[in-house]
């Protein structure tokens, strides 16, 4: 280093060194600090001479506590510039950067931190609204009705089952299951045939009764035509029910 290589003195300044530095600055003025140690006859580096003059020996330096106006200005400048003490001291006449930094760290730093914390807490309380529990609202989505056919049996999805067996067929409801309608084709066919036979008998009886009443009123000349009507072939009637087409003369 510069001091160790040249054997320069370090540490506290003596009163003799301070007087030599004052005489040199009064004679040659401030500046050209690299020539000050040689002119003053000091075994100090140029940086040490400059800092000693600017921080302690300069006549315009103010000593003592800062006034209220200076403290207010210091707070504003620190909020704007941060810890740039040399820039802050340049805006406080008669105050050095070292004095401003020491005063801040000793008297104002703790108060500033506490005030900042309080302001942040107030902002959080103002910005964040009181949290209220969110109420969940159940939404019922409509389900489309679909008609599905499974194994020859029909039912509506999502709806109670409907009895799809016509009452005219005479089928019992014992053949209906919980989920689908089961059908027995043989029993259904037998019931269907029995119903048809019962209907045929009733139709023939009604037909015969009407013919008998007509015989009592119509003259004997129409008996031949009535006999021809009664001679309707039963086999042709059965063929009609079986699905065969028969041409009648």
Swiss-Prot record:
Keywords in alphabetical order: Activator, DNA-binding, Nucleus, Repeat, Stress response, Transcription, Transcription regulation
Recorded source organism is: Arabidopsis thaliana (Mouse-ear cress)
Q: Name one Pfam family in it.
A: Myb_DNA-binding
The UniProt entry, under InterPro entries, shows:
Homeodomain-like_sf, Myb_dom, Myb_TF_plants, SANT/Myb
* Gene name for this UniProt entry: MYB90
Subunit structure, as described in the record = Interacts with BHLH12/MYC1, BHLH1/GL3/MYC6, BHLH2/EGL3/MYC146, and BHLH42/TT8.
Compartments, record wording:
Nucleus
Transport found in the keyword field: no
UniProt GO BP:
regulation of DNA-templated transcription
Tell me the ranges covered by the HTH myb-type domain, including all copies.
5-57, 58-112
Transcription regulation in keyword set = yes
Protein name per UniProt:
Transcription factor MYB90
Taken from the UniProt entry, a GO cellular component term is:
nucleus
